[in-house]
């Protein structure tokens, strides 16, 4: 499966390794799931992970981002053509949606699924980490993960 990972899930996955975000991150790091990215997403990951409140080591963050860059799939994204009546709660979420749509991701995994309520019109589903894990397990049991 190919996914876009919202920054909130990446951070939660590093902080709470046994909870659903951590298990999703394990799937990415283990190669069972392919992370889709563009430079804007990796820049946001870097900026957020560097915040002092998380206390992640700079070398660890650099190593993680290098791995995600190498193991993931780079996407050249484009702005979404959204009708005016669609309101995006957080415009900083748009790069994640754009990567998901252009790359035809299987899912955008986020802790804020309601921020991406417009994605189904593009054939993309925003899922919580727990929902994604259920779908991944179902697909794996059918040999499609």
Short names for language-model regions:
Residues 19, 36, 59, 87, ...:
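Residues at secondary-structure transition points
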Residues 14-15, 49, 120, 137:
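Short, flexible helix/strand-to-coil boundary loops that buttress conserved ligand/catalytic motifs
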Residues 4-5, 15, 21-52:
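PIN/NYN-family metal-dependent endoribonuclease catalytic core
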Residues 94, 101-107, 113-145:
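Acidic, PIN/NYN-like endoribonuclease modules and their adjacent C-terminal/linker elements
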Residues 48, 53-86:
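Helix-adjacent hinge/juxtasegments
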Residues 70-107, 113:
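Active-site neighborhoods of divalent-metal-dependent phosphate/nucleic-acid chemistry enzymes
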Residues 6-7, 37-38, 112, 128:
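A secondary-structure boundary/capping signal
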């Amino acid at each position: 499966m190919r996914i876009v990972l919202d920054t909130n899930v990446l951070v939660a996955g590093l902080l709470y390794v046994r909870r659903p975000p951590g298990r999703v991150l394990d799937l990415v790091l283990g190669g069972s799931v392919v992370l889709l990215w563009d430079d804007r997403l990796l820049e946001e990951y870097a900026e957020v992970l560097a915040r002092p409140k998380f206390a992640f080591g700079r070398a660890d963050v650099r190593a993680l981002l290098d791995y995600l860059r190498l193991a993931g799939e780079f996407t050249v994204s484009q702005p979404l053509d959204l009708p005016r009546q669609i309101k995006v709660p957080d415009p900083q979420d748009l790069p994640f949606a754009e990567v998901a749509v252009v790359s035809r991701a299987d899912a955008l995994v986020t802790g804020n699924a309601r921020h991406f309520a417009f994605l189904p019109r593009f054939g993309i589903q925003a899922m919580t980490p727990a929902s994604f894990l259920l779908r991944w397990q179902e697909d794996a049991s059918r040999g499609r993960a």
